[in-house]
Amino acid sequence: MKTAWVFPGQGSQAVGMTGSLPETERGRRRLAEAEEILGWSVLEKCQGDEAELGLTRHTQPCLYVVETILADLLTERGQTPDYVAGHSLGEYSALYSAGVFDFETGLKLVQKRALLMEAAQGGKMAAVIKFDPEQLQELLAAYPEVVLANDNSAEQVVLSGPAEAMEQVLPQLKAKRVVPLKVSGAFHSPQMTAA
């Protein structure tokens, strides 16, 4: 049997997501190293205010640090993946896990990415689950500023676009569920061009 590690991206963050990681030697070292690189405490952001953690400049580095600590702990326990993948920001954790770059290099890349994306903030994203594909295509044609940001499966996609346009499109969707994502911008859309 093959093993794949798939790392999530922004929107998957949650207050308390460090769990018991600070109690491990690896966790303590990585959290201290991250604080030195970033100039602020990942642990404090992850255990503090949800709005503060939700800021892109904090969310992305926090997710990267937590994900890479988890990957390192699994590796230390003799578990290794046959494949790695990531969704958006999670690609950085996947690249780290594959040995493409070291922790510090990855964190510096993620920090820069987060600052650029936050500067281009504005807009919204939403996951759309079990939807009418024809109706979705019609809405995207009628509102070209709203784009299909992620085509995750035949039953789940993510839309991204300016807040006003998203607020017009989302209520019209024929879908089982529409879940607004906890992000500060219209990521994976033309609004990120400046980033």
Regions found by a protein language model. Give the residues of each.
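Helix-rich "cap/lid" substructures immediately adjacent to catalytic or cofactor-binding pockets
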Residues: 2-85, 159
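Alpha/beta catalytic cores of group-transfer enzymes, especially the acyltransferase/condensing modules
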Residues: 10-12, 38-40, 98-195
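Gly/Ser-rich oxyanion-binding loop with an adjacent helix/lid
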Residues: 60-127
